Swiss-Prot record:
Gene: mntC
Keyword Secreted: no
Induction context: Repressed by MntR in the presence of manganese.
GO BP annotations, alphabetical order: monoatomic ion transport; response to zinc ion; transmembrane transport
Pfam families: ABC-3 (PF00950)
Protein family according to the UniProt entry: Belongs to the ABC-3 integral membrane protein family.
Transmembrane segment boundaries: 17-37, 42-62, 68-88, 98-118, 143-163, 166-186, 189-209, 228-248, 255-275
Compartments, as annotated in UniProt: Cell membrane
Membrane topology: Multi-pass membrane protein
Keyword GTP-binding belongs to the record: no
Protein name: Manganese transport system membrane protein MntC
Signal peptide: none
Length: 435
């Protein structure tokens, strides 16, 4: 397999296709980042479907299969579709998503009708226009690939030159207008770049799948970073890798189109990112949720033990803790073992624990934090200027006046935690009445 792949890579046409799909994937990923952040993912799909009638009309007017004419016709049809998407909501009460659906289906339907008409003509069956539906990179010749690679390189260059301006109109359009930046021109330029990226991918990826090539690398990159620069770089790399992987797979798998394999490669990278990304991935979220659940159960068990300590019941069991907190036996036992490892409690008999001096101190602060938060919720209108999230509520960071006010309310309600220390000898001999 590897020997045949190596032999295929020595072929000049394979090398040109690899270079073309690499640049196409990179340009699609970079521009797709702006499309995703501007919440215009469906517009890319509509542009791709709108391009089909332009390809068919270009063939009808020229009578020959010429990729430059096809790209020109597809670009004009894509721009017309984009204009219609923006025009329909202005002239009617139709929302933008409905306008996208209308334009997508109407243009694609017209394209299918024209494609069927062409293939019923004498030379239509030889035109190969059906390759624009799903893509057929193997049918590209050297001149076609040079054209696609050249346009992709120009798109990347323009994205680099106008990076600051595109970033500004993506995140804060009103601020850009206030600075006197030509927003309308930049929006039009970005739309033209997106149309060009869609158009040059039609012969390789196809009308139906090109939107996925535009969006999937951007979504993949979003899992790995919070910064736009990093997102664009990762999206470009993801798109390029997907293009190369799809080309290599189609080279080794006879009869398989390059476009679907490129999308499949991008989808696999997306699934890997969705699961394994360090911050946004499902695995990382599951680990954080598990740690949060374990920390919360540990705090709840410590609070239950501390409340027993305030009532002079120094020893606890799993059942006595579960009477105070609704926890499963396994989770409660795990929390008790964690507290024992932290030296907040110590085991005096099998299944019986007692609180230590460290546990008293930690339980005091935990109880104080929770009870102050409860009092804050009772007087939220009076104390509305402090952090309202319990996870970030820290009494030590509160203003002195606010903290003293909460202390006085705790004393008023009799909820102030006790900080007394019991003698260790007395603790060892005392067992709670529940046992």
């Amino acid at each position: 397999m590897f020997e045949s792949l190596w032999l295929q890579l020595q072929h000049p046409n394979t090398q040109w296709v690899l270079a073309g799909t690499l640049l196409l994937g990179t340009a699609s990923g970079v521009l797709g980042s702006f499309v995703l952040l501007r919440k215009q993912s469906l517009i890319g799909d509509a542009m791709a479907h709108s391009a089909l009638p332009g390809v068919c009309l270009a063939f009808l007017f020229t009578g020959q299969k010429s990729l430059p004419f096809f790209l020109l016709g597809a670009a004009l049809a894509g721009l017309l579709g984009t204009f219609c998407i923006q025009l329909i909501p202005r002239l009617s009460k139709t929302k933008e998503d409905s306008a996208i659906g209308i334009v997508l289906s109407v243009f694609f339907g017209v394209g299918i009708i024209l494609l069927t008409y062409i293939q019923q003509q004498g030379a239509g069956s030889q035109s190969g226009l059906d390759s624009f539906l799903f893509g057929q990179a193997a049918s590209l010749v050297r001149q076609d690939i040079i054209l696609i690679a050249g346009i992709s390189a120009v798109l990347l260059l323009l994205c680099i030159v106008f990076f600051k301006e595109f970033t500004l109109i993506t995140f804060d359009l009103a601020f850009a207008k206030g600075l006197g930046i030509p927003v309308r021109f930049l929006n039009g330029l970005l739309a033209c770049l997106i149309v060009c990226a869609v158009v040059i991918g039609l012969q390789t990826v196809g009308v139906i799948l090109m939107a996925a090539m535009l969006i999937t690398p951007a979504i993949t990159a979003r899992y790995w970073t919070e910064r736009l620069t990093g997102m664009i770089i990762i999206a470009g790399i993801t798109g390029g890798v997907s293009g190369v992987a799809g080309t290599l797979l189609s080279t080794t798998m006879k009869g398989m189109a390059t476009g679907p394999l490129m999308i499949l490669s991008a989808t696999l990278l997306f699934l890997f990112s969705m699961i394994c990304a360090p911050k946004r991935g499902l695995a990382a979220k599951a680990i954080r949720l598990m740690r949060l659940r374990r920390r919360t159960s540990r705090e709840q068990v410590l609070l239950a033990i501390y409340e027993q300590y305030e009532k002079n019941n120094l020893c606890v069991t799993v059942e006595s803790v579960r009477k105070k907190r609704r926890l499963s036996p396994s989770l409660c036992l795990k929390a008790l073992n964690d507290l024992e490892q932290e030296r907040c409690i110590e085991r005096i008999e099998n299944g019986i624990w007692q609180i230590t001096s460290k546990g008293i101190e930690k339980g005091y602060h935990t109880a104080l934090k929770q009870r102050m938060y409860e009092v804050y919720l009772m007087h939220e209108m009076e104390l509305a200027n402090i952090e309202s999230d319990q996870d970030y509520f820290d009494p030590d960071r509160l203003p002195r006046e606010t903290r003293e006010r909460l202390y006085s309310l705790l004393k008023l309600y009799g909820r102030m935690p006790e900080r007394r220390k019991a003698s260790h000898d007395a603790e060892k001999g005392q067992i709670a009445n529940e046992f």
